[in-house]
């Protein structure tokens, strides 16, 4: 169980990073959103030009240009670009917007060099500039989003949750992906009930927006109900998952839960559904289903499943499996096939 939890925690981290596309942190000068307009001071033309020169050093391909136009030639290395920007932040006459844009570009530079601690520091300075002056709302939101993503990526989950709270206050409305991140951060902190609250909120947001639930968003509920030992809700969500995302792992999990609850008919139906969808690929799986069908007193179906497994070369033709086949045919009163199976089994004795 601990191994499975560790694997899921790793999977959660990866899925969150993919969902938020951390690598897509951008450097574009942010524009105001349609809310109460902020009176943001302008960026001087000379500063903008110097920032562009630094950006070219950091990543020439990030500069906007016409289709087919080559990337500009940098006049230094990415580190040179960062050093240039750092010097510019020391100027005394910078307004809050200029300072925030400089630190935003520095965050891009540090991220390009894969220096996560300095990237975080730079984004913190973007937010700090907004505390002492006025910066664009879009840039502040971008910085806060980057901060909760980056802190999550280095397993600083409490810090990530703090920045999420700030981002949500600024955003003014729910966001399913962010609520999912809150849920997974609380999961990593083993705050399972709090995590479940946000996991359910994800579903509420999705339904309100008339969207489809993503697979990993729904599966998180399964994991959390399991942690809380709420087996009825584990089953309820799995029953939905096998319809919306009919994968073998969910069917197997559901069948196992039915077995645990001693709902043998449901368990057998689930295993047979897996088989009918062509999801069984192992000898042990087909033999298990055949034995379950035999125990349920449907020997003809048990024989059919096993015979097909032998034909498909999934089931090994050995004495044990052929004896089982012979027993199935005997109990289904198909004596000709039973005799044939007994004879085949005797060849391996």
List the predicted regions and their residue ranges.
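Helix-turn-helix repeat elements of alpha-solenoid scaffolds
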Residues: 58-65, 69-86, 111-128, 149-164, ...
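Generic helix N-cap/helix-start motif at coil->alpha-helix transitions
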Residues: 45-52, 96-103, 135-146, 171-181, ...
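Solenoid-like repeat scaffolds
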Residues: 36-42, 89-95, 127-136, 165-173, ...
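N-terminal leader/linker segments that initiate helical-solenoid repeat arrays
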Residues: 16-19, 24-124, 128-131, 137-142, ...
């Amino acid at each position: 169980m601990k191994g499975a939890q560790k694997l899921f925690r790793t999977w959660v981290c990866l899925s969150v990073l993919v969902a938020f596309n951390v690598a897509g942190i951008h450097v574009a000068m942010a524009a105001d959103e349609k809310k109460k307009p902020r009176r943001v001071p302008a960026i001087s033309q000379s500063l903008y030009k110097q920032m562009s020169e630094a950006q070219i050093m950091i990543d020439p391909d990030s500069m906007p240009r016409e289709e087919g136009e080559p990337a500009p030639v940098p006049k230094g290395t990415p580190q040179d670009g960062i050093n240039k920007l750092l010097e510019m932040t020391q100027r005394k006459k910078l307004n809050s917007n200029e300072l925030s844009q400089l630190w935003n570009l520095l965050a891009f530079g540090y991220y390009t060099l894969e220096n996560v601690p300095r990237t975080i520091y730079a984004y913190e300075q973007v937010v700090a500039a907004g505390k002492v002056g006025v910066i664009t709302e879009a840039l502040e939101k971008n910085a806060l989003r980057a901060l909760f993503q980056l802190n999550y990526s280095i397993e600083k989950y409490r810090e990530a949750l703090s920045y999420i709270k700030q981002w949500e206050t600024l955003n003014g409305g729910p966001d399913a992906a962010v609520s999912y991140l809150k849920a997974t951060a609380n999961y990593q902190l083993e705050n399972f009930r709090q995590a479940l609250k946000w996991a359910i909120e994800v579903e509420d947001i999705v339904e309100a927006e008339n969207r489809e639930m993503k697979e990993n968003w729904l599966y998180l509920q399964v994991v959390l109900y399991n942690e809380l030992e709420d087996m009825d809700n584990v089953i309820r969500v799995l029953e939905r998952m096998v319809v919306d995302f009919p994968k073998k792992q969910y069917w197997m999990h559901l069948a196992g839960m039915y077995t645990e609850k001693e709902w043998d008919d449901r368990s057998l139906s689930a295993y047979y559904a897996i088989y009918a969808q062509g999801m069984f690929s192992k000898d042990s799986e087909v033999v298990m289903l055949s034995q379950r069908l035999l125990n349920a007193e449907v020997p003809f179906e048990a024989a059919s499943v096993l015979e097909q497994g032998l034909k498909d070369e999934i089931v090994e033709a050995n004495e044990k499996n052929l004896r089982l086949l012979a027993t199935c045919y005997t109990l289904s009163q198909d004596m000709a096939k039973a005799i044939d199976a007994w004879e085949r089994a005797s060849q391996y004795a």
